[in-house]
Amino acid sequence: MSGTVVAVPPRVARALDLLNFSLADVRDGLGPYLSIYLLLIHDWDQASIGFVMAVGGIAAIVAQTPIGALVDRTTAKRALVVAGAVLVTAAAVAMPLFAGLYSISVLQAVTGIASSVFAPALAAITLGAVGPQFFARRIGRNEAFNHAGNASAAGATGALAYFFGPVVVFWVLAGMALISVLATLRIPPDAVDHDLARGMDHAPGEPHPQPSRFTVLAHNRELVIFGAAVVAFHFANAAMLPLVGELLALHNRDEGTALMSSCIVAAQVVMVPVAYVVGTRADAWGRKPIFLVGFAVLTARGFLYTLSDNSYWLVGVQLLDGIGAGIFGALFPLVVQDVTHGTGHFNISLGAVTTATGIGAALSNLVAGWIVVVAGYDAAFMSLGALAGAGFLLYLVAMPETVDSDVRVRSRPTLGGK
């Protein structure tokens, strides 16, 4: 995965690979592992677990758009990544020591704010390093390494949890965060073109729009529709894995964390090739048909979970998450870049749409936790699946294809092979 795929020196490409690999576990947070830890070790109920999960999401929602604006303006993008990783590490170390509802809520808020740095900063560093011509392929590679990192961290967590219990999730997260700091520092400061990183597209000396004006968000119809679609996607998706983790833990109390790791590894192994293929073919195939496949798979997954609570079935269905999430992760920054290219508003727009994903995720955990308490797990899964179906229809009807037709023509293989 090198050579023509990235237009950067090998050292920078390798640093980006390691950064995406090590940040995988960090930028996603503790997620379902925290649910299992609180359920098994501290006997929390599902509603309380859903509440603290939502707190982290809400904190990220509040921080995401301002942080996107900051990433647009600053040339210290590496420092932002380092600061976020250090804060996530500190929160992960503190959670087992302060496990009350108030303490976990505060630490989840810190984690949510700190982790909101990673999506816009990584996308900006990537765009500034490779430019728009190679962005789709490099994002696919980023996501492939991200999913490989998630699978590796989950495998390590599952193995260690077998011997030391659910508390190891905090150790693994802290370790990956520290590795991400080292990877960030391996990217030379002059490797990133900060005009390209915020979505500028102009010749030297030409005037260009000022970046990060909030009014651009409300007037970009495609960006608003895409934001609504990703709210639906994450509302449907975010709570599914934590709910599966709770089911596995309830039926296998001694192996809940290890089984959750199996779920994550299974999905992440699928995501690696999916993300890479999507990144290499998104220009030729277009964004819309691929995104619709992601919505369709998510819809099916929600209903399939209700057919059995057998551990093997649940882990097997979780493989579908590898398709849906692999597609979403690779296409998400590409669509935002498509609809904001040349404006200088890439990172604030990415931050705003990431805020939409946070809204969806926070609502997902909060509402799904309440549905489980009131009506059970099957009702929660069916509700989430139905919402994914609604998102499919929204994207099908309202969202146009965003990749330029000339780009699609240039990206299609010829009869000669390339």
From Swiss-Prot:
Source organism (scientific name): Mycobacterium tuberculosis (strain CDC 1551 / Oshkosh)
Protein name: Uncharacterized MFS-type transporter MT2531
InterPro entries the record matches: MFS, MFS_dom, MFS_trans_sf
Name of a matching Pfam family: MFS_1
Family: Belongs to the major facilitator superfamily.
Transmembrane annotation, as ranges: 51-71, 79-99, 110-130, 163-183, 224-244, 258-278, 289-309, 315-335, 356-376, 379-399
Keywords: Cell membrane, Membrane, Transmembrane, Transmembrane helix, Transport
GO cellular component: plasma membrane
